[in-house]
Amino acid sequence: MSGFEFHPTTRVIFGESCIDQVGAIAKELGSTRTLLVTDPGIVKAGYCERVKNSLHKQALEVLEYAEVVENPTDLQVQKAAEFARSNSPIDLIIGLGGGSPMDVAKGTNFLLTNGGRMEDYRGFNKATKPM
């Protein structure tokens, strides 16, 4: 299968070795200090190190939160947000892995930009600040 790029409202890049582009993309977005949200399996597989290397090649600082568990709860998101706050400022969040790291990364973004708890955002149009 050949690689491709798809640009709806969210940019999706697919293809062999595209993980190595993460640093250049983060720099293009203006990041200087990135939070990488992932799980122990992704770390063990070596993907986290590849992303960190790509970010470091662009002289970007990386903070790693690799404690995501399968089917994360609101408490997991709260812990990730607390980690992010204790290491602020952060100007980019990357969710690396499957659905669980992605969900925790998105939830962390909600809490960092809008405050409160995850339960505050059940429903529609609850987040009032841009993320």
Language model segments and positions:
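ATP/NTP phosphate-donor binding region
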Residues: 1-92
